[in-house]
Amino acid sequence: MPRFFRATCKISLFAAALLCGGFTAKAATYYVSQSTGDDSLDGLAAAKAGAKGPWKTLTKASIQYKPGDSILLKKGDTWNEELTPKGSGTPEKPILISSYGQGNKPLIDREDFKQDRTGIRLDNQGGYKIVGIEFARCMTGIYAEYAKGAPTQKYLWIEDCYFRDSLLYGRYEDYPKRKIGLGVCLFSWETDKKIVMQDIMVKNCVFRRLASGFWTNSPDNFNKNASFVYNFANLNFENCLFEEGYQWQLGIRGVIKGSVKNCVTHDIGRGFRSFNGVAGAMFFRCKDWIFEDSEWGFVDIGLGSGDGEAFDFEGNCDNMIMRNCNFHDTDGPGFLLCCYASDGHPNMGIVMENCVINAKSKRPLQPRVRAAIINTTDWTEATWNKCRFYLSKGEGIMTVMDREKDKRSTFKDCFVKNLSAACSSPKHPAQMTEMAAAAGATGPTFLLDFGRTVSINEFKLKEDPASGISRYIIETWDDKKSQWKSCFNGMGIGGEFVCAIVPQTTSKARLRVIANRKEKTVLTAFDAYNDPPGDPLNVARGGDTPNRPGK
């Protein structure tokens, strides 16, 4: 065959292969180092070698990327810049933003959370996996925005990230004019019933000292004209910690399908006053969610905020299932089932299974009612199945603000108990051992070894006056998985403190002291019980919840 025809055939075959997808560009890995990088290099190597080597700035790294590409930030380095990568990945080949090297997480520190500064910004993009990055003093750590009419994006994975120190709080009714410090915000300009972003995972992340942790939002922040409009889908949280924040750490609006599993929300609202209430979490206009093995505790109304509940279904939430969750130590109710505050649609299909509510309702402000549950209308459809209610003196089970003939609350195989009667049976015999401080803690660990498998539903703690424990975690040993599992996150102990937990079966328990206000740590009692659950509580649909205040 003549050379001309051989060349022509090769070119034709190459073109055909491109058209058929036979060739794909090889994924590239880019390196960025504030300490050793140079923007004149190609970014394709971790160490400098001729023209190869890491970039220096996130501005330089804000280029077009292809599916499967990686952007790696050097551990131990710090940037006061925004990373705005271009392009999208796919669920199968996401664009990875992560780290390389040794040391602490790479840090994006914007230095002033009162300025509208972001750590990573996405614009109508999907297919990103963000792993192992720290965000500090950003008004928003990760901000992703989606335009009206934009095509649906898929896949956003955020794992092992640390969001901290953004306590700006202003009246944010006109958001996205940003006036509030957030860890992550997904914002949709779409007003139609259309999904703009789906398949989102937030895993093993810490949100600390933020006005609010994670938001989904739209231009009408309170969504009064957006009934049953869902712009986000399949949003999942797993093994995350939210603590020392101001307002609701999960502010979730307009999301169909999602989950919260093995998450802890702790110490919310102190030293702060909100214009529209405080809660551990607030969900509005959401559907088809599952919450499992999670905890919301120590929610404070601070300097005069309203509400103060552990959890708030704000309205228009349908088919929401909560299993094995603990709601405790709140200034307001343990649980708020709200309506009217937003669009007026009641919550439907709320199911609570094997949950513990030990609210205490220490200082309710708005409304001035002490109850484990505040339900704004009998039209709320909620089923409480095998739940346990601990009532402090004068605290009721449920208060309904607007009474209706159609009462849709049901209590089945539940129990109600005075908190003062807790830990009244014989404690489990156990050997308590004090051990040195564990990683990440400033105090010792106290271990209870029962020598056999026991069932536990309550702990009693006592502390010497010379001690000042201010943060601790109680964990039980999972024999099947051979690992420790959190069952209660606490603050002060004082003379005596009762920790009611979701029932556990275990052979060991431990208390890890995380923080102490004083030099000494002296725990005089760490006792475990399988106490009687209290009085049966059964209310059929249409019935009235008994007036049974705690004693």
Kindly label every feature range from the protein language model.
Residues 428-432, 437-488, 492-550:
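Aromatic, loop-rich ligand-recognition surfaces of beta-strand-rich domains
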Residues 1-13:
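Bacterial N-terminal signal peptides that target proteins for export
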Residues 84, 110-121, 137-149, 171-194, ...:
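Extracellular beta-strand/beta-solenoid scaffold signature
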Residues 72, 88-140, 165-179, 488-493:
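Right-handed parallel beta-helix/beta-spiral solenoid domain characteristic of secreted/periplasmic
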Residues 52, 69, 176-187, 380-395, ...:
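Acidic, glycine- and Ser/Thr-rich low-complexity intrinsically disordered tracts
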Residues 10-22:
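Bacterial N-terminal signal peptides
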Residues 34-80, 84:
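Acidic Gly/Asp/Thr-rich repetitive segments characteristic of extracellular carbohydrate-active
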Residues 94, 101-103, 126-137, 152-169, ...:
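Right-handed parallel beta-helix
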